């Protein structure tokens, strides 16, 4: 492999590996067991089967946004910031699942979701000046996290307090 090949494909490799790590970690953390099934849910909640395909689409779009942003970044400092933003976002995403599904604390997950939402917004805003397409590719993620936060908030209201 030449240095040129690696320079071109490095962001793709990062996006694919990071996306797979997050998907596997999220699958482990998401326990749709008796506790979850016992929660009262709002009538507007999407069916459970929708979440897997939606997160798959979101991760594909986010991965594409990362790769495009990486290739259009004006300098190494911007690339470093982009990598950090995506890592932080992935960690927020994973921690939310652990809080909600493993620790059975939707109330804590709701507070943590603010960080998740802000991390998506940060990526969207950070990329818009040098890669507007990357920024737009993050928009569905921001919308989906907004819906998830509304669902999370409603679940807390319907079922809280949690201990």
Residue ranges, per PLM feature:
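Hydrophobic alpha-helical segments of small multi-pass membrane proteins
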Residues: 83-96, 110-123, 141-145
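Juxtamembrane boundary at the C-terminal end of a transmembrane helix
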Residues: 150-163
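Membrane-interface helix caps and helix-loop-helix hairpins in membrane proteins
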Residues: 76, 96-107, 128-132
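Helix-adjacent hinge/juxtasegments
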Residues: 60-97
